[in-house]
């Protein structure tokens, strides 16, 4: 596994790289087989940074060298040392002849580490490995040195020189002397490694000793580890959880305790109502250790309910009302709940399970008159049971005692100041332990809770600016930042529940209101948080920020597979102990004993986390991943084994597993793999899973195989499992009919799943863009053209599309492009002309930022040169001649590529900011220079690099960035790029041929007749400001609420149009009401890439085509929407018709032109290829000031829904007006869908004014 502080691990996939250039002999193929997959890297203690191959060697002779062990003994000890450092497989290079066991060692030796074998077995296996390598490798002399020199670890015959290869070397001299050398400036580190080696060499003398248990730490190391396992501060006191709230209520009775959707409650009111409920619960039999289910909606009653159960002496078991009935029933049975606390919204559902219920709203008046007697509950009684995903297929309840929760809250009160508690957002489900911090931590410290449904309710939350502290998972925080929804009052950010990445820290640094960023780690089994790390927002952000040091009263240890301590810097499993440990898993003694271990030395309990960590010299822990099948997905802890167990229980499935995958577009999703003789029906499979698993554990894709691939030891080989994109969500045998087969494959390519009988394209997750690509694929493969109108007026089922394919006659050949220079396409010419009219205008400069992690600067520069050579659009200047503007390609090296070295991340950011400022103000001289400039900023001693791409719009567009980023990643990962299917010149030539044929003019004339009334009506668009400088722009990115997004999709499905059509219709209606017009001219932004061969091109192909939207109130919503859907599909089908053709046709009819001042567009997310097994490349455009049109709305598809990006000319649409338009647009969408409109979105507010 590649780690940040080690030499990046590499391996040869074929062995050809090692044997390349050698004469082809019969033995070469044999050598390649031996070398296939051989790892050439090295894992060493984390504080050693093996980065500089020119660093001087440090030299040390181990103490045991005086004992004159033979070379084979030292070699075995060295291999054991590397194995215990985490190198399960290692390749040693022998660049010089060395004698081992009386024979010359081979040039390379592949070896593996087996912790359970004895010293004698290790010695015998080493002899076998040496013999095997000698048989399969024949290199000698220069060939030997070339082969061995590729390895990070060397075995030398003499002390290394400056030119010696490798990073770590064991020296076995002919006179029997032994030494270690390391390319690292830290002499003490080498001394420590040598000490480990010496002690292991002595231990190997015992032939029966287990190599994984050989002692290797000295007394100083053991004392140091003991000192770092806990903090010196005294542990917080154990007590009763709700006593903290009761004491606070007595101190500040009138202070507001919670703002919720239904009402606000003071501390006195919350105390009184929870006490009344506690009286009722005690009367129902609740006492210490009695479990009470809590199934309540998320309003003020939730807090009353939780506190009521605690104050009655009971233990609350939270139940999410959205959980499947089977899961709720299992949790109630497993916890043996006495009763369930419900409200009016959940009563019927719980009662249907046959459980005794107590309704929150009933009986409160009588209980208010009764005093709450003192409870017998103590620190050792249960406070709550939270169910987590279980590897056995069933969730398991983590039982937390009052004393553990009390101690945790005491720490929280000391760690955070009073002003930080003044406004805490409570957005986490009570079924997850982060809620314990949010709810009870705030109430213990006299703060005010802001209780919302979830974090994505923030945009509509009226008190959002009162929130001072946010406690959430990194993925949700990243989404909030992307949406621009981080409240302005937030001063403290707690991030927990998932690994925190450096790129998110850098984004948070750009939020001026955030003054404190805290990275917290901890499993539910250790009461929410176990370690804490404060991040310096003014210092360089590491790519993997650490999880910090333990909380007071908590112990941390990094242990190996034998539960023995590991040296500082060596990766192992994290064990937790101390005051926060849970009692165990409720009712599951065997699982409790498996995870909650007893230290044989001290007798203390400690919890096996399953997390792989290492401890730095200062005691700070770094999180490296998981050791088991547990994953964190969107903040939820998920045991993949539970999903696999549920999959395997489906009839016909013999074996199953689940994985969290990440595709090339950066989308993370759960995928289920099934071994079955046939593909089970997708709907039936989803229904089966939905009966047991909560929504966040449901796979979004499935792969069905005849059998799951296995490793040599019989385990499922997860690396060999195919990606879901390749196999699909519900694999089926392809139809035998060629037309049906082509439709099946094209549908699956666009939607990631094969077609299902009767399911419409939009209902299956499609949109207009995917529809275009689907038909383009079919047209290319079958030479049959199905009109896009097939997606209007009906659900566009597979059956309907197949029938249209059968009816479509094969197309004839397209008009051949004429000979001669094609010149510029009309889209390119349009932007070139704009540059000529305003040579100093920089509004068409596009700036993109690409962040690259895991590649060297030389490799990045080489890949960039390849891309510049590949994509001629980035290096074409434009000359003006008798035939008009003509492009002329420059050499790739003529495109400026500047490389700067930054001393640290702060310096890098400053260089980038300077670059953005400089490039944003610098014009392109398209007549004499390439339309692109590149700035590569490399950070010293870091795996990161930043690329600033400055390019004129004439040569680039949105899709181009996605292509550029994806191809850059492919090259940096060592892949090859296929031959481009077209060029910008060929696109322009085809356009010229189509114009000559008259086809484009005929379409344009038809549109012109329809648009003529609007083209002559100047009032159909906002009036432009008279003053100059009206191009100054405002940009506002606002999330579309989940309710609106769902309503829009439902409306689109009901009317058989795309969701974008529904959004566009509402956009036009809101603007029409704003402007007082019955019809509106809207420009629709289109990619202009209707042909498949254009998909992989870098260039400018965008088109802006006019759409007339009727807004007459006498027409029904559905009629208007179907009309927009029909017209939009016509635009998409003919998106190659240039805007100039439409404008010319209008002028021929007496119109002065086409006043497009308002536009709307959509695309499927940003270009952000994510890390899979290689280099990570993240790309995005940098927003530039200014607005080219009066108002534009872009809808960006994101995992959580839509992001609406509004841009307007400042003098017409200020930020306040844009925000009102957005709210009115959402209201209109809900109204059109016939959905209930909330009080905040009343029908009276549909007009934005």
Curated annotation (Swiss-Prot):
Residues 823-1150 are annotated as: Condensation. The keyword Ligase applies. Residues 245-633 are annotated as: Adenylation. GO terms for biological process: amino acid activation for nonribosomal peptide biosynthetic process; enterobactin biosynthetic process. It catalyses: holo-[peptidyl-carrier protein] + L-alanine + ATP = L-alanyl-[peptidyl-carrier protein] + AMP + diphosphate. Residues 716-735 are annotated as: Disordered. It is an enzyme of class 6 (ligase). Induction: Expression is regulated by the PhoR-PhoB two-component system. Its cofactor is pantetheine 4'-phosphate. Keywords: Ligase, Phosphopantetheine, Phosphoprotein. The modification O-(pantetheine 4'-phosphoryl)serine is found at residue 768. Its EC number is 6.2.1.67. It comes from the Bacteria. Disruption phenotype: Mutation abolishes AMB production. Deletion of the gene almost abolishes the production of the quorum sensing signals 2-heptyl-3-hydroxy-4(1H)-quinolone (PQS) and N-butanoylhomoserine lactone (C4HSL), but it has no effect on the biosynthesis of the quorum sensing signal N-3-oxododecanoylhomoserine lactone (3OC12HSL). Deletion causes a substantial reduction in the production of the virulence factors pyocyanine and elastase, and it reduces bacterial virulence by about 32-40%. Pfam families: AMP-binding, AMP-binding_C, Condensation, PP-binding. Residues 734-809 form the Carrier domain. GO terms for cellular component: cytoplasm; cytosol; enterobactin synthetase complex. Disulfide bonds: none annotated. One of its GO terms (molecular function) is 2,3-dihydroxybenzoate-serine ligase activity. Involved in the biosynthesis of the antimetabolite L-2-amino-4-methoxy-trans-3-butenoic acid (AMB), a non-proteinogenic amino acid which is toxic for prokaryotes and eukaryotes. Adenylates L-alanine and loads it onto its peptidyl carrier domain via a thioester linkage to the phosphopanthetheine moiety. In addition, loads activated L-Ala in trans onto the second carrier domain of AmbE. Can also activate L-Ser, Gly and D-Ala, albeit to a lower extent. Belongs to the NRP synthetase family. Modular protein that contains an adenylation domain which activates the alanine residue into an aminoacyl-AMP ester, a peptidyl carrier protein domain which bears a phosphopantetheinyl arm to attach the activated alanine and a condensation domain involved in the condensation of this amino acid with a second amino acid bound at the carrier protein domain of another module. This is AMB antimetabolite synthetase AmbB.
